């Protein structure tokens, strides 16, 4: 499961030099001719990764994907990131709220559903991912899962 950041970098004639991104693609220190920098529209970065964090996946399915669990790419707005961060911080501060605020989910690919050390490690990881993402004012965020 991934949180990706897409930044629009397409250059237009009407942009000032300060607004333009410079895209350079090299391999082994040499320019890659097969990728034309002028045609690059987006840079996509993996800013978060979860492995078997079923509670986090369930939150995205319920709150971002309208209950549809289909391994698609889903836009995540800033307020959704802030909400998930708030929920994670509440669960971290008071473990007794975990089952109510961020319930685990069962499934073939998810591992255990216990509220144990692994569950709370996922909470810490998520807090770190979201705090970093929310510090950055550029780009759009997308959640995707794959099995």
Segments the model singles out, each with a brief description of its role:
Residues 1-147:
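Acidic (Asp/Glu-rich) sequence patches and key acidic residues
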